[in-house]
Amino acid sequence: MDNLEYRSGVGIMLLNKDNLVFAACRNDMKEEAWQMPQGGLEAKETPEVGVLRELEEETGIPPRMVAIISHTKEWLTYDFPADLQASFFKNKYRGQRQLWFLARYLGRDEDININTDKPEFRAWKWVEPKQLPDLIVAFKKPLYEKILSEFSASL
C-alpha cells in the first residue's frame, strides 16, 4: 500500500492556563484511544481555518476561545495500521499528512462540550505534555514525539 497517498489534515495541541494539554478518548474504537483533536481539511480550506473548524466540531470550543501560538515547521506524516487503512478509509489513504498547531485555550472547562452533533469522543481530560506519547495509540507515538519536540520551547 506504499503507493497510496496521505490524507491532508490538521491537528491542535491545546494548552490550558496550567500548560496542560487537552486529550480526548475516541468513541469509535474498542480499546481506549486517546488523542489531541485532529481532522481532515476540506476542499480549498486553509490549515488555520480547518484546525479551528475541527476543534469546534469535536469539542464545541469556538474560535474566539482559542489563541494560536504557532504551528509545526513542516507537515508531519504517519501511516495507518493495515486494519484501520481498510476499515476507516477503504484503502484510499496510506496515512495522514498533518500540519499541527499549538494554541492557548481561553475558555473554561465548562465551555468544552464533546457531546456534539456527531460525537467523536467519549471522554476528555487535561494531561501533562510528557504523558501524551504513552497515552495515545502506538502507531501515533512517533508523531506525538515529533509534535512535542517541535513545541517544547513553548510548553
Curated annotation (Swiss-Prot):
GO molecular function, one term: bis(5'-adenosyl)-pentaphosphatase activity
Coiled coil stretches, renumbered: none
GO BP field: nucleoside phosphate metabolic process; ribose phosphate metabolic process
InterPro entries in UniProt: Nudix_hydrolase, NUDIX_hydrolase-like_dom_sf, NUDIX_hydrolase_CS, NUDIX_hydrolase_dom, RppH
PROSITE patterns: NUDIX, NUDIX_BOX
Domain of life from the UniProt record: Bacteria
Key word Hydrolase present: yes
Database matches in Pfam families: NUDIX (PF00293)
Recorded family membership: Belongs to the Nudix hydrolase family. RppH subfamily.
Physiological role: Accelerates the degradation of transcripts by removing pyrophosphate from the 5'-end of triphosphorylated RNA, leading to a more labile monophosphorylated state that can stimulate subsequent ribonuclease cleavage.
Protein name: RNA pyrophosphohydrolase
Species of provenance: Zymomonas mobilis subsp. mobilis (strain ATCC 31821 / ZM4 / CP4)
